[in-house]
Amino acid sequence: HLIDVWDATEITAIDPDPYYDYQVARPRVRLTEDGKRVIDWPTTRIFLADPPGAPNSILLVQGIEPNLKWKNFVSELLDIFDDYEVSLIISCGALLADAPHTRPVPVTTVAATPELTENLDLEPSAYEGPTGIIGVVQDEATERDIASISLWAAIPHYVSSPPNPKATLAVISKLEDLLDISIPLNDLIDESRAWQEGVDQLSAEDDEIKDYVTKLESSVDASDLPEASGEAIARAVSYTHLRAHET
């Protein structure tokens, strides 16, 4: 979404050969308008954007979690960040949660260091265990004195297939607060409404899911839906890995 609304320009891409197992992350064949076959390889692309109202340019990173050589991958990515004098990294993702699709999507903000956690008045994470590529990026960013924050939208595990425009909308709202800018939504509000109506219809046709959603709604309404903890986020990331829903 951000690549489109900010009219971002691709400036580079990381060579996928050292980092991806193509039997796991398979390349895809597509046809161009003139009927030519083109292979799209799984990789990470970096775009440059100049959002209206932003004091600085913004790099947007779009890709999927690599299968191999994470340390080298992260080092190569952050070398690009260093070339552009990046001072803050904001990672966006989603986690599966016991959250009903009928309620606002909770978004949790997690900072990479205790100092940043305190400065932003965030809930500290005491999680220890497996992590995803975002955790490795944050660790290396800290070593390079680059501030790092991650935003996680809690999406219903019973309707986890992408895209989820309602979750995207919630993450963008958080980004607007963090960056203190207005981000165009274009068709995102209509897409979010259509997505929820579609899930409403599906759940109405399945009594088991309908009852389950009702129970989730009651639980959420009773507790005002506290945001997911950093530990829950890390557990979800270790299970789902980094998903290519970058904004």
Predicted regions and their residues:
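Internal, conserved structured core segments that host functional sites
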Residues: 64-114, 137
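Short, basic, glycine/proline-bearing loop/turn elements
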Residues: 56-67, 119-123
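N-terminal short beta-loop-beta anion/metal-coordinating cradle
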Residues: 1-63
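Flexible, glycine/charged-enriched surface loops at secondary-structure junctions
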Residues: 10-14, 181-192, 209
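Conserved small/polar residues in nucleotide/adenosyl-binding loops
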Residues: 240-247
